[in-house]
């Protein structure tokens, strides 16, 4: 005889109407990102500091215009001063909150930001990612994304961590490598009537 499979319900009745709503969740707001240093085995992620990172990042990214293909609103840059001006504009924002990805040598090799920050819904996104060729397809490149995701979930208290990639970008496989496999629904998108709101994909 086949063993019965019990599927846990993903909804509960509304206390007044009886209609199904998402399972109850803790609605305590998450914390906003801050100036932390996240240590890994291959390097670290730290708050972007212009004084330390500008020269490092220009050295490893100058002449590699392809790294700006999907951030063409910003780069590529013609010279170091133009790049430094753009980097300085990143430092002042609380959203996106920018971090430098630093190798064991102490030199910055890339940047990433936590953005679209919605503490009340406990949803956050990683974006504005710029990896120099020295960081692409390296253990540190993967580890940096893991460190940011762990920080968002375990320290800040977010429930949903988004990473949006252009489907034709060569780095599209990176999110699943670094964190988790992708699902075909918007899970834990926001808290609604005290429960978890999910948006399923259109029927095919």
PLM features: what roles do these ranges have?
Residues 180-196:
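Conserved catalytic-core motifs of GNAT/GCN5-like acyltransferases
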Residues 163-172:
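Conserved beta-strand-loop-alpha-helix junction that forms the acyl-donor binding cleft
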Residues 154-164:
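Conserved GNAT acetyl-CoA-binding A-motif
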Residues 174-176:
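Hydrophobic residues within well-ordered alpha-helices
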Residues 148:
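Flexible ATP-lid and adjacent glycine-rich G1/G2 motifs of the Bergerat
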Residues 141:
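Glycine-rich acyl-CoA binding loop
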Residues 2-138, 151, 155, 197-204:
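GNAT-family acyltransferases
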């Amino acid at each position: 005889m086949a063993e019965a499979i019990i599927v846990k319900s993903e909804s509960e009745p509304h206390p007044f109407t009886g209609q199904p709503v998402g399972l109850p969740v803790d609605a305590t707001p998450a914390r906003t990102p801050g100036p932390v240093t996240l240590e890994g085995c291959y390097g670290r992620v730290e708050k972007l500091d212009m004084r330390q990172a500008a020269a490092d990042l220009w050295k490893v990214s100058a002449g590699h215009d392809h790294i700006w293909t999907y951030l063409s609103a910003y780069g590529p840059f013609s010279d170091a001063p133009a790049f430094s001006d753009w980097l300085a504009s990143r430092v002042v924002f609380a959203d996106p909150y920018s971090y430098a990805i630093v190798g064991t040598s102490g030199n910055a090799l890339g940047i990433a930001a936590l953005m679209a920050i919605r503490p009340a819904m406990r949803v956050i996104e990683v974006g504005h990612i710029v990896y120099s060729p020295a960081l692409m397809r390296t253990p540190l490149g993967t580890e940096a994304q893991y460190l940011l995701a762990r920080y968002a979930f375990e320290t800040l208290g977010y429930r949903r961590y988004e990473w949006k990639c252009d489907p034709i970008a060569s780095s599209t496989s990176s999110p699943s490598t670094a964190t988790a496999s992708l699902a075909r629904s918007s899970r834990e998108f926001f808290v609604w009537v005290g429960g978890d709101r999910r948006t399923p994909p259109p029927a095919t």
